[in-house]
Amino acid sequence: MNRFLLLMSLYLLGSARGTSSQPNELSGSIDHQTSVQQLPGEFFSLENPSDAEALYETSSGLNTLSEHGSSEHGSSKHTVAEHTSGEHAESEHASGEPAATEHAEGEHTVGEQPSGEQPSGEHLSGEQPLSELESGEQPSDEQPSGEHGSGEQPSGEQASGEQPSGEHASGEQASGAPISSTSTGTILNCYTCAYMNDQGKCLRGEGTCITQNSQQCMLKKIFEGGKLQFMVQGCENMCPSMNLFSHGTRMQIICCRNQSFCNKI
């Protein structure tokens, strides 16, 4: 009996540590051992019926223990499986919560980014009127310059107004031209003077010159401060009638033909 109980205890320990397939195999081996032990049991039952009944009760108790052990092993495995699945579910739930928090943080970040960009957009839109204002101020700066240019234009008109005076002098030349046309090819003795006072008196370089071809007798009057200072007369090939101004000094050029002295004071 002690040996049989020892074998059953070893079986229960093996069934608790083995897989689900091992208890079935071990139960088959125990049944085989039980059938083997039943032979001495029958032998014992021949000798002593009370021993056979005790052996039967012991075998039925061992079978009950084996079933209880296998059921406890299955329930323990089921409990471990449920515990593992519960931990897995909790781990998934825990891993799902950071993802949810990250998703929420991502939504919060995405929500904040447009709000951060909106002031910058408003700032740019606020700067745009400044650029437009600067562009608007630039034409206003250019407008006075245009007005200044328009103000300078009358001075140009004034210069153009002076031009008719030259035309008037050229008109005098034209009036003298018919006279020269009648005497083309004639020789004219022109009075020359290097320095003549305002009274028409030659003070230096007095003489005569002969006009040839297109030469004319020319008189130069020099004025300073609006007052006649001196005069110069001689023969010149090119004789334009005009007024020249330079640093407060004015020079009047008078051209004449068929006259020995152009000064008419």
From Swiss-Prot:
Q: Where are its TM segments located?
A: none
Q: Does the keyword Secreted apply?
A: no
Predominant cellular place of this UniProt entry's protein: cytoplasm
On tissue specificity, the annotation reads: Testis.
Composition skew (Basic and acidic residues), residue ranges? 69-110
Q: Which Pfam families match?
A: UPAR_LY6 (PF00021)
Give the region (9 X 5 AA repeats of [SV]-G-E-Q-[PSA]) as residue ranges. 110-174
> Where do the segments described as 3 X 5 AA repeats of S-E-H-[GA]-S lie?
66-95
Region ranges (Disordered): 62-181
An example Gene Ontology cellular component term from the record? acrosomal vesicle
Residue ranges of the region described as 4 X 4 AA repeats of S-G-E-H: 85-168
Q: Biological process (GO) annotations? A: spermatogenesis
Coiled-coil stretches, from where to where? none
Which residue positions carry a glycan here?
A: N258
Q: Where are the sequence repeats?
A: 66-70, 71-75, 85-88, 91-95, 110-114, 115-119, 120-123, 125-129, 135-139, 140-144, 145-148, 150-154, 155-159, 160-164, 165-168, 170-174
- How is this protein named in the record? Acrosomal protein SP-10
